[in-house]
Design a protein with these regions (language model features):
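Generic C-terminus detector
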Residues: 232-236, 242-258
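Internal nucleotide-binding/catalytic subdomain
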Residues: 11, 18-161
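Short amphipathic beta-strand starts and helix->beta connectors
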Residues: 3, 222-237
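A conserved helix-loop-beta module that forms one wall/lid of the active-site cleft
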Residues: 1-18
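Active-site "cap" helix and flanking loop/linker of ATP-utilizing ligase/carboxylase catalytic domains
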Residues: 112-134, 152-222, 235
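Short beta-strand/turn micro-motifs at beta-sheet edges
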Residues: 83-85, 185-187, 232-240
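Short amphipathic alpha-helical segments
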Residues: 16-18, 196, 244-250
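A structural signal for short secondary-structure junctions
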Residues: 141, 189-192, 221-222, 240-246
Length: 258
């Protein structure tokens, strides 16, 4: 009845790998079968959600709120598909950049007015005022309208790795102001730099992959470079080895994306 493409999602937490976009009805049936019968996502896929497929530009809004005031961090866009050219399965994120070139102050005000403030008002009306981080995954449709694809109450990965380096204020002071209910007085300058991050993943991710491979890292002292560890650990000999699907995020900071 829904037609294709559609979106099939696991109803539980699946480390960013629980969303599928089948192009045909047959693929949709196959994915549902793998999740419900073969339990490819374990308990996370015990129940599924079927959603409309929405076209447009997807982006991430990270914001801090003390329950009354919202402060939006620099915009970001992550890339979830495993392969180049926006191909392959969805992942927890294979890379990101910040800020998004086509996002301006007018757009941010629109997000605050249309998405964030109504959300906070709704929470207050439900008797659950919220203080903390809001992650809104937003699709900007070709006509400029907004669809909220997901909400989280945490920073994103890899979005945080590119947003925080270009954030012009003191993030610790911002969190402190949030906890004190004084966020309305917290200001910071516009980003003057851009950040681009690329995830280094284990072969086979997000499907079956092996771990325990020894790795070495060079370039940690390069100016304008950050290397964030994720799926790494030390073996009994003290060697750095892989321990997960997404192993490292390498971030470069510069004056422009070019």
């Amino acid at each position: 009845q829904q037609g294709a493409p559609i979106v099939v999602k696991a109803d539980g937490l699946a480390a960013g790998k629980g969303a599928f976009i089948p192009e045909t009805r047959e693929d949709a049936v196959s994915i549902c079968s793998m999740m419900l019968e073969n339990m490819i996502l374990g308990p996370a896929g015990k129940n599924i959600i079927i959603e409309d497929y929405v076209e447009g530009q997807e982006m991430t809004i990270l914001a801090i709120t003390d329950g009354e005031t919202v402060r939006i961090l620099p915009s970001s866009q992550d890339h979830k598909r495993a392969l180049d050219g926006d191909k392959g399965n969805n992942t927890g994120g294979m890379g990101a950049y910040s800020p998004v070139p086509w996002v301006d102050d007018e757009f941010m005000h629109k997000v605050e007015k249309v998405v964030l403030m109504p959300t906070l008002e709704g929470l207050r009306n439900e008797g659950i005022p919220f203080c903390g981080v809001i992650y809104a995954g937003i699709m900007v449709k070709p006509d400029g309208s907004l669809s909220v694809l997901e909400y989280n109450v945490r920073l994103g990965d890899p979005e945080a790795q590119v947003v925080l380096p270009v954030f012009g204020g003191d993030f610790g002071e911002m969190i402190l102001a949030c906890c004190k209910g004084e966020l309305s007085g917290f200001k910071w300058p516009e980003p003057e730099r851009v950040a681009l991050g690329v995830v280094m993943a284990s072969g086979g991710y997000p499907e079956k992959y092996d771990t325990g491979f020894e790795i070495s890292i060079r370039g940690e002292d390069l100016p304008g470079t950050f290397i964030y560890h994720a799926g790494t650990s030390s073996d009994c000999g003290g060697n750095l080895v892989t321990s997960g699907g997404r192993v490292l995020t390498v971030v470069g900071i510069a004056g422009s994306l070019r």
